[in-house]
C-alpha cells in the first residue's frame, strides 16, 4: 500500500513539473490568459460569392478593381495603392486619385496589379472571377464584392469595415443610410401600389429590370409594383428579363422608368425602334399621363454605394414631387 501511494505521488509530481501548472488550470499562462497555440487571424470574411477569406493581419497594400468600392473604402478611412480608371459614371474620390491606375474595370492590367505586390484585392464577381486563381497563386487575397441591392450594399460596407479594422464606423454609416431611406419612405402615399416598369436601353437592345436590379430594388422599397417581377431572367443577367411590347400593353404600367448604358444618340435610336415607334406604346397609361422618367447613370447604372438613399429619394421625388416640397 505504501509503495503504491509513493508511486502515485511520484507520477503526480512528474506531471506537475512537466506541464508547469496545476492540473485544473492547464489552459492558463503566467498572465492568467488562455494559451494560444496559433496566432489569431485579423479577420475572417465571407464575400459575395460565399468564399471564406482569412486575413492573417490587417492589409496594408490594397488594390481595388471595382470603381464603386472606392467610395466604401474612402468612407471608412481606408487607403489603397491601386484603382481602376475613372469614367463618366464612376468618379475617383480625391484621396485616391494618386493611387496607381490599373486600367478600365473591363480591361484590368493584371501584370501591373501583381507588380504592385498587394496583400489584398477587391474584385467584381462578374468581371474578375477569372483572376482569382492568378491572385491566389501569387499569395494575394481576393475578396469579391458585387453590391446591387440595398442589403448587398450594406453587407459590402460591413466587409470593407472589417478589412480596415473599422467595423464600428461601417455600422454607423449603414445606420445613417437606413435613417435617410426611412425618412423618404415615410413621405410616400400609404399603400399606393402603383404599377411600374423599368426599361434598360443600350445601343443594341432593350430589356426590363427586375427587383434585384438597382432601380428595381429602390422601387420595391418605395412600394411600387414592378410588372416584370416573376418573369424569367435572362441567362447570365439575373437582374434583367426580355422586353415585350405585348406584355407592356397587357400589364399597362402607370409609370415608366428608363435606365441606359452607352451613347445617348444611339440609345434614343434604339428606344424609338423597339419601344416608342410602336403605336401601342402611345396608348400606355404612363405615356398618356406623361409619367416616363429617365434615371441617371451615376445612381442607377453603377452601384450607388453610400448614395443609395439619394437614388431612392430621386425616384420618389420623380413620381410624387408634391410630397417633397
Roles of regions detected by a PLM:
Residues 66-116, 120-125, 227:
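A short, structured surface patch at a secondary-structure boundary
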Residues 48-50, 100-111, 233-245:
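Short helix-initiation/N-cap motifs at beta->coil->alpha
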Residues 154-155, 162, 171, 182-185, ...:
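Structured C-terminal subdomain patch of bacterial secreted/periplasmic proteins
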Residues 3-6, 10, 19-68, 168-199, ...:
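Bacterial Sec-exported substrate-binding components of ABC uptake systems
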Residues 61-65, 81-84, 120-124, 142-145, ...:
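Structural recognition of the beta-strand scaffold that forms the well-ordered cores
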Residues 130, 146-159, 193, 197-218, ...:
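Extracytoplasmic ligand-binding site segments that recognize negatively charged/polar headgroups
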Residues 87-90, 208-239:
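Alpha-helical, coiled-coil/dimerization segments enriched in small aliphatic residues
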